[in-house]
């Protein structure tokens, strides 16, 4: 029996395969986060996502008080190619039994 038919997870990339055509969360280097629908991926974790919401965390320093100011910048992207070497983690959608 083919494991693709069973929907089982035997290898780490199987979990990503089960998330095809689902919304996923991707944490990237440089304090970037992506949420979007996964259309394709490869063994290097290169991915094609659609309807993406990108959140970038920006830390600025107030020159007068020397306090750090943290801002989140958000933008929406219709279609995005994600290069796998910048990926830290991928979280599949929550599944209910």
From Swiss-Prot:
Record GO terms (molecular function): RNA binding
Biological-process GO terms, alphabetical: mRNA splicing, via spliceosome; P-body assembly
Annotated ranges, domain Sm: 11-96
CDD domains listed in its UniProt record: LSm3 (cd01730)
Coiled coil: none
Top-rank taxon: Eukaryota
Chain segments annotated as transmembrane: none
InterPro entries cross-referenced by the UniProt entry: Lsm3, LSM_dom_sf, Sm, Sm-like_LSM3, Sm_dom_euk/arc
Any Pfam family matching the protein: LSM
Subcellular location: Nucleus
Homology family: Belongs to the snRNP Sm proteins family.
Subunit structure: Component of the precatalytic spliceosome (spliceosome B complex). Component of the U4/U6-U5 tri-snRNP complex, a building block of the precatalytic spliceosome (spliceosome B complex). LSM2, LSM3, LSM4, LSM5, LSM6, LSM7 and LSM8 form a heptameric, ring-shaped subcomplex (the LSM2-8 complex) that is part of the U4/U6-U5 tri-snRNP complex and the precatalytic spliceosome.
Main function: Plays a role in pre-mRNA splicing as component of the U4/U6-U5 tri-snRNP complex that is involved in spliceosome assembly, and as component of the precatalytic spliceosome (spliceosome B complex). The heptameric LSM2-8 complex binds specifically to the 3'-terminal U-tract of U6 snRNA.
Protein name: Probable U6 snRNA-associated Sm-like protein LSm3
Native source species: Dictyostelium discoideum
Organism lineage string: Eukaryota, Amoebozoa, Evosea, Eumycetozoa, Dictyostelia
